[in-house]
Amino acid sequence: MTNKIRVRYAPSPTGLLHIGNARTALFNYLYARHHGGDFIIRIEDTDRKRHVEDGERSQLENLRWLGMDWDESPETHENYRQSERLALYKKYIDQLLAEGKAYKSYVTEEELAAERERQEAAGETPRYINEFLGMSADEKAAYIAKRQAAGIVPTVRLKVNEAGIYKWHDMVKGDIEFEGGNIGGDWVIQKKDGYPTYNFAVVVDDHDMQISHVIRGDDHIANTPKQLMVYEALGWEAPAFAHMTLIINSETGKKLSKRDTNTLQFIEDYRQKGYLPEAVFNFIALLGWNPGGENEIFSRQELIELFDENRLSKSPAAFDQKKLDWMNNEYIKNADFDTIFALAKPYLESAGRLTDKAKKLVELYQPQMKSIDEIVPLTDLFFEEFPELSEEEKEFMAGETVPIVLQAFKAKLEAMSDEDFKSENIFPQIKAVQKETGIKGKNLFMPIRIAVSGEMHGPELPDTIFLLGKEKSIQHLEDMLEKLK
């Protein structure tokens, strides 16, 4: 095996890029880049039933969107898809058959299901029982001939050393070991369709591509002893393994499930909503790893420099949507305005809001946006009917000084010339109302904000009033005063 660090991300093209898979890719990427190694993309497409058209393109496109690059992939190298490597798998399966380390199995799915049912009914752990057990050579030959005559296509099974101990030092979990007798018996390495099973193909691929470290989710721990059996059978050195902890939903404490439709879990979803790739990259990098300290905002280059596999967490990583929203807002607030406006334009255009005020609106709401698509609901005030007040807003507007403030401020706006109606001239008018009425603070600003915008929170009030326009602002004040009578 090479001394150079070589890691891989090996997705199945079965759909969109899930945030858990994105984390696997990202940690492999950070590990390779930190150590000056190679990051490889390999496509594991042996499960033809689950193959999704365009699945590979979607995976690579979303990895690129996140800002990752790679050194080797199906785009630049031949035979980096498992479906292109069948001859290589056959070579090693034939070798194991010739050496007596594997054999052809003619047991049917129906027979396996019946045996499994019997074992469960008897309270036994389900396992494959060697179909040739107790047969003489002649009986075995007759059995095979009969099965072949019936048109039964065999699988190929690896012989399991039931007394063997399969152990490794996991970079995250520490020492782990499995007994060969607990694996479930001889297992299939080649299916009836001639395709290898995952646990066989992945070993051949990792060895052939000289992968030095396998970094993946801890749902693969149970696969590792089977893979170690293949390494042993073929006389190869196994790579180092690191199994990252699972990702849980911070609200439920349960494993993040693709079936949980209340949580956005696919990178494509975040792209469509206008999350910034730098923010999503930063957020995912902290799912099960942190560099220490209080800071949580890091550039891609900083994360590469800081990445330390010894700080991979042993506890589940909590997926917190609110934290991602906070982080994305931090990136949006600090981004160049022209960048944010360019990202916001398609959303405004789709909503029919790409007016001459568009730039000012994006500038006004840039500090508030948790995702770029929020520019549409945030600007409803300027394009839709006045919103229905919440109970909290209604309660506040029931205050006895509210009509006094609104009447005084309406008079101030009416007295302003169109030429003077600018953001910088509106705040002094509010202060003038304070001086005249003696009402200040929340009791001054909140009635004006609610009357003009229908909300208790928002961007700078003078900017909102200016963009709303003099006529519309006065109309909103009059309407509110009428409601308060």
Swiss-Prot record:
This is Glutamate--tRNA ligase. One of its GO terms (cellular component) is cytosol. It is found in: Cytoplasm. GO terms for biological process: glutamyl-tRNA aminoacylation. ATP binds at residue 258. It comes from Streptococcus mutans serotype c (strain ATCC 700610 / UA159). A motif ('HIGH' region) lies at residues 11-21. One of its GO terms (molecular function) is tRNA binding. A motif ('KMSKS' region) lies at residues 255-259. Keywords: Aminoacyl-tRNA synthetase, ATP-binding, Cytoplasm, Ligase, Nucleotide-binding, Protein biosynthesis. Gene3D superfamilies: 1.10.10.350, HUPs (3.40.50.620). It comes from the Bacteria.
